[in-house]
Amino acid sequence: MMRKINEIFYSLQGEGYHTGTPAVFIRFSGCNLKCSFCDTQHEAGTLMTDDEIIAEVSKYPAVTVILTGGEPSLWIDDALIDRLHEAGKYVCIETNGTRPLPESIDWVTCSPKQGVKLGITRMDEVKVVYEGQDISIYELLPAEHFFLQPCSCNNTALTVDCVMRHPKWRLSLQTHKLIDIR
């Protein structure tokens, strides 16, 4: 199967539970949602085989691989996850949660969008990009970890205030942007 890849790069995870972890990011092209705050060019990309993806990922020393996008669930299947596991990788995904995922993914970060129906039931962490919306509906999701991330620097104080009022949540900043890395 050919998969449309926007880019593959090595950096530190800058958000959520695994913040600070060295990881290889596989950014897939395309998304089934059109979020106003999204900072990713979704359509650009190169079609790659699993062999090409594994070869690229294997150039870096990290054990952790993060599937991101766009929306990676548009392009992944059990075969790719199995290949990554065979290469000794711990596979994480950052998804909007609208489409089913291979069960063998090691860590699922769901970033649900208000009013959008979820297509997954397993998630290890929930990350909400906060714009002042009611977060109580997200607290019902079956996750162990809950993160609020400011939509922009302009609403960081609003996000901090929300976390202080809702101690189930933790603050997630885009630390990769704060320290000026990818």
Curated annotation (Swiss-Prot):
UniProt keyword annotation of Metal-binding present: yes
One GO-annotated biological process of the protein: queuosine biosynthetic process
EC category name: lyase
Top-level taxon in the UniProt lineage: Bacteria
Catalytic activity line of the entry: 6-carboxy-5,6,7,8-tetrahydropterin + H(+) = 7-carboxy-7-deazaguanine + NH4(+)
Binding site for substrate: L12, Q13, G14, R27, T68
Protein known as: 7-carboxy-7-deazaguanine synthase
Organism: Bacteroides thetaiotaomicron (strain ATCC 29148 / DSM 2079 / JCM 5827 / CCUG 10774 / NCTC 10582 / VPI-5482 / E50)
